[in-house]
Amino acid sequence: MRALAFSGGKDSMACLHLMKDSLDLAIYVDTGKSYPETQRLVEYASTLVRMVIVKTDRDRQNVEQGIPSDVVPVDWTAFGQEVAGKKSVTIQGYLNCCFSNLCEPLTRKAKELGVTEIVYGQRDEEGYKSPSRNGSISDGMVRIHPIEDWTAEEVLAYLSTKMDVPAHYRIKHSSLDCYDCTAFRKDSKDRVDWTKEAHPDLYAEYLARVELLNAALKESLDCTIYTG
């Protein structure tokens, strides 16, 4: 059985159009924090392939493990606070947040469904990507990366022949992911600016979280930098 890991971004959308005739289904993980644009693209994709939606409780996970961050002071983690004492904000590494709320639930559902091949829109030129490559076997499933050697421009050019390309597909993180994500800060400026313009209500939620995170990071640095 062949499934597509669908995020709503341009790369997984390109894989859908490229391989829809050989796909048995697609799997989308709904964290409860997706943009309206992503929700519409999931609905669109559902007209092309059987869509299995996995719901996760990201809010609960963040309450337990913390706000995701690129920089993680140990004493502000859930484990660190057991030793160093309770902090006003709990922080977790972004990889843990993404794995717990997106990657692991998707893999678990794929295995549950009996998927033997799973298609990802991973590309070599991306800054963040799995160490797995096209043909790798992970969790008993063969990973297929049909656009591994494509550029972002090639993806957009291909999609323009298949659909009306959404304007936000020009954003670096075109899958958008969680609208209040406080990680990937260096690469998220275009997403944050776009959110502020297109969805001021969602931007307000993001800003509240990032201000909490910034204050905690500043406090941790003030505690650890020796200025003797």
Question: At which residue positions do the language-model features occur?
Answer:
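ATP-dependent adenylation/nucleotidyltransferase module used to activate substrates
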Residues: 1-162
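ATP/NTP-dependent adenylation/nucleotidyl-transfer catalytic domains that generate, transfer
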Residues: 4, 160-228
